[in-house]
Amino acid sequence: MKVLLLEDVAKLGKKGEIKEVSDGYARNYLIPKNLAAEATGGYIKHIEESKKIEDKKKENLRKRSEEILEKLKGTKIEIKAKAGEKGKLFGAVTAQDISEKIEELLDEKFDRTWFDEKVNIKELGTHTLKVKLPQGVRGEIKVEIKPEN
């Protein structure tokens, strides 16, 4: 029996794949637990169309992420913060602060969770941060922390 997997199933396949399984396995385990549905002709066409639409959305999101990264590479991100005489900040510059500054500069949404590592900058100067945008687009941005006057 051909089934369409509705969830990832260990040792069988990933969500959205069509697999050939025994009738008993499908009727007694996969279908009752909503892990799969019987793959009929119309249902398969519907799923394939949905998958094409989803793939287009993912591709558009990947392109958008690459555009944002290119804009960031050409943009000087400068944040002012209160600092002591030796260059230590009073407090820290966080991912949220940098995200807000990027949104202000680019007029684009930039989520603080897109930073690869935890951001907690406590010194003046230029810092290189790794970012991971949606669809696996990775890159680095430079942020310059300057003292407030």
From Swiss-Prot:
Species whose genome carries this gene: Petrotoga mobilis (strain DSM 10674 / SJ95)
Protein name: Large ribosomal subunit protein bL9
Entry GO terms, CC: ribonucleoprotein complex; ribosome
Pfam family name, one: Ribosomal_L9_C
Lineage: Bacteria, Thermotogati, Thermotogota, Thermotogae, Petrotogales
Alphabetized Gene3D superfamilies for the sequence: Ribosomal protein L9, C-terminal domain, Ribosomal protein L9, N-terminal domain
TM annotation in the entry: none
Function, as annotated: Binds to the 23S rRNA.
Disulfide bonds: none
Similarity section: Belongs to the bacterial ribosomal protein bL9 family.
Stored HAMAP family: Ribosomal_bL9 (MF_00503)
Domain of life: Bacteria
Record-level GO BP terms: translation
Gene Ontology molecular function, alphabetical: rRNA binding; structural constituent of ribosome
Alphabetical list of InterPro entries matching this protein: Ribosomal_bL9 (IPR000244), Ribosomal_bL9/RNase_H1_N (IPR009027), Ribosomal_bL9_bac/chp (IPR020594), Ribosomal_bL9_C (IPR020069), Ribosomal_bL9_C_sf (IPR036791), Ribosomal_bL9_N (IPR020070), Ribosomal_bL9_N_sf (IPR036935)
Alphabetical keyword list: Ribonucleoprotein, Ribosomal protein, RNA-binding, rRNA-binding
